[in-house]
A protein has these predicted regions:
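Intrinsic-disorder-associated, low-complexity terminal segments enriched in Asp/Asn/His/Tyr and depleted
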Residues: 3-4
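Non-heme di-metal
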Residues: 7-189
Length: 189
């Protein structure tokens, strides 16, 4: 987490007040980061570049604070990518199966029909997010991130080089970036 906390014995947080406080600190810092990013955008549009830069700098600070609390909640470090994909899918599932339907029902009950509709529509987006994370996790488990059974068009996300083959190149022949920069080329135009 930080040098300050490294010497602390890792204790079981589950169910403690400290766990609750870490979750509150993580949520608070995360929300502050987003708000300050929005505030920076407004300041920039209104012609206040210095104020925008200060909001952006502070947002970056809040991001690091949130990361520190999140790491503490995760036992000292952020988990591996597969675990992160599973955590993300579970979070998205909770949002579209429980949180947004409940919020939509409550908003409708209180007469906020437009907000109820927005809660419902965002819930559908979260359902798509869950599906995407689950598909990505399956690709990772099955070794299909950079290899497929049939020829594909792969594109380097750094320089745009395209390659046709069953696997992405180990290294881009144009910019020398590693295979990790390749993805399947998608055409949406």
């Amino acid at each position: 987490v930080s040098d300050y906390l490294r010497g602390e014995q890792i204790m079981e947080l589950k169910g403690t007040k400290t766990e609750k406080n870490l979750m509150e600190a993580f949520a608070g810092e995360s929300m502050a980061r987003n708000k300050y990013t929005y505030f920076a955008s407004v300041a920039k549009k209104e012609g206040y570049e210095q104020l925008a830069a200060i909001f952006e700098e502070t947002a970056g600070n809040e991001k690091e604070h949130a990361k520190m609390w999140f790491k503490a909640l995760c036992g000292g470090s952020i988990p591996d990518t597969l675990t992160c994909l599973d955590m993300a899918a579970s979070g998205e599932n909770e949002e579209w199966t429980d949180m947004y339907p409940r919020m939509a029902a409550e908003a409708k009950e209180e007469g906020f029909t437009q907000l109820a509709a927005l809660f419902t529509m965002v819930g559908q987006i979260e359902k798509e997010h869950e599906a995407r994370y689950r598909a990505l996790a399956a690709n990772l488990k099955e070794g299909k991130v950079f290899a497929r059974e049939e020829q594909q068009v792969w594109v380097c996300r750094n320089c745009g080089y395209t390659y046709i083959g069953k696997s992405a190149p180990l290294k881009c022949p144009v910019c020398a970036h590693p295979q990790s920069y390749f993805e399947l080329k998608a055409r949406n135009y």
